[in-house]
């Protein structure tokens, strides 16, 4: 005999959306084989499993719909602390079935990504200036080559690159 508990949960937030316990029986030459036999006997069409999954889906939707503003604020707070990747992950984890929150999350993700690019641009310019001051012009130029034309400091990067090339 084996009792197995199944969970639908979010490990990051420690939220449990649904759970169910199944009592199973299996036969085998040793306990491991008996457990494997029991697990193979799970009928995935059992009403309690369908109910378990449906409840989990509904709870996930309710969770994201009710906590959307908090999730978005948390992401913006992470971005404010320059934890851009974690912030983007937070908003891109919103399931698309939660349409309104998902769409808001996409907009926030785009803004955070732009902030990340701006931050990286400023960092690359600072690193390039440091390398230039040490007469390491190749390294300075390589920092500047990572800067995309879409960011606001691109022109500053081009001016610095021209100074390096003219040296």
Regions found by a protein language model. Name each.
Residues 16-142, 149, 155-158, 162-167:
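C-terminal/domain-edge helix-coil "capping" segments
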Residues 1-17:
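Surface-exposed short loop/turn segments
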């Amino acid at each position: 005999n084996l009792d197995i508990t199944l969970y639908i949960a979010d490990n990051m937030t420690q939220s449990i959306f649904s759970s169910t316990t199944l009592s199973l029986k299996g036969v085998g030459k040793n306990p491991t084989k008996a457990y494997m036999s029991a697990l193979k006997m799970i009928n995935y069409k059992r009403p309690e499993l369908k109910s378990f999954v449906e409840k989990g889906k509904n709870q996930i939707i309710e969770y994201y719909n009710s906590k959307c503003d908090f999730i978005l604020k948390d992401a913006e707070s992470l971005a404010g602390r320059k934890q851009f990747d974690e912030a983007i992950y937070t908003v891109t984890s919103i399931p698309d079935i939660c349409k309104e929150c998902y769409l808001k999350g996409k907009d926030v993700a785009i803004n955070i990504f732009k902030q990340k690019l701006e931050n990286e641009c400023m960092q690359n310019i600072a690193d390039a200036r440091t390398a230039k001051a040490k007469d390491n012009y190749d390294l300075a130029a390589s920092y500047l080559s990572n800067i995309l034309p879409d960011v606001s400091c691109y022109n500053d990067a081009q001016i610095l690159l021209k100074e390096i090339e003219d040296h």
